[in-house]
């Protein structure tokens, strides 16, 4: 018997001995078997059970949603002192044999590295499920008219008729440039992968009865 009722001191001791040679309750990755023992314990064990404490911290480091998605089969009823996991029989030993005073640092390092790699793999899998971030830019355009007789309101209306996938027009204002002439400053937000700022400038300049030139006054990544 590997371990029995983990809510009893004896069962906890047996679980500690089991986890001295095993990283997980079943197999080489966390599963519902680990979750059933984790839930049965209810709280972190004392530091005296060093192997159980290490395993408990590792399982607790996963979010509840991640633990719920683990595969495998939960262990049967844990109470009653009945065995939950089978293990190869070991010869009886004195209590002193349960404590390895000269444990291998290499084994501990390998275990820590393996757990680290598993965490990295789990994080990468979680991250891959998140939607990709969309690169956007905020652009301030200076749209200059031919002269002071240009209908600036009509010019702005024409500019705002331009529609492109990934283009969103923002606030605008008229800025004096001299001799009674105003230029139109208009803000827009573009998705970098969808909107070419050069093409947008060309489309604005197509309103040649109103627009003399278009310049980029400011360009910032969002």
Swiss-Prot record:
Pfam families membership: Arc1p_N_like, EF-1_beta_acid, EF1_GNE
Question: Which residue windows does the record flag with biased composition (Acidic residues)?
Answer: 94-111
Entry GO MF terms: guanyl-nucleotide exchange factor activity; translation elongation factor activity
Keywords in alphabetical order: Elongation factor, Phosphoprotein, Protein biosynthesis
Any one GO CC term of this protein is:
eukaryotic translation elongation factor 1 complex
| Keyword check for Lipid metabolism | no
Its GO biological process annotations read: translational elongation
Q: Where is this region: Disordered?
A: 90-111
Q: Which residues carry this modification: Phosphoserine?
A: 104
Q: What InterPro entries does its record include?
A: Arc1-like_N, eEF-1beta-like_sf, EF-1_beta_acid_region_euk, EF1B_bsu/dsu, EF1B_bsu/dsu_GNE, Glutathione-S-Trfase_C_sf, Transl_elong_EF1B/ribsomal_bS6, Transl_elong_EF1B_B/D_CS
**The keyword RNA-binding is annotated on this UniProt entry:** no
**Xref: PROSITE patterns:** EF1BD_1 (PS00824), EF1BD_2 (PS00825)
- What does its PTM field state? Phosphorylation affects the GDP/GTP exchange rate.
Q: List all membrane-crossing ranges.
A: none
Functional note: EF-1-beta and EF-1-delta stimulate the exchange of GDP bound to EF-1-alpha to GTP.
- Which PANTHER family does this UniProt record tie to the protein? EF-HAND AND COILED-COIL DOMAIN-CONTAINING FAMILY MEMBER (PTHR11595), ELONGATION FACTOR 1-BETA (PTHR11595:SF21)
Q: How does it assemble?
A: EF-1 is composed of 4 subunits: alpha, beta, beta' and gamma.
Question: Of which family is this protein a member?
Answer: Belongs to the EF-1-beta/EF-1-delta family.
Q: What is this protein called?
A: Probable elongation factor 1-beta
Give the organism, scientific name.
Answer: Drosophila melanogaster
Q: What is the lineage of its organism?
A: Eukaryota, Metazoa, Ecdysozoa, Arthropoda, Hexapoda
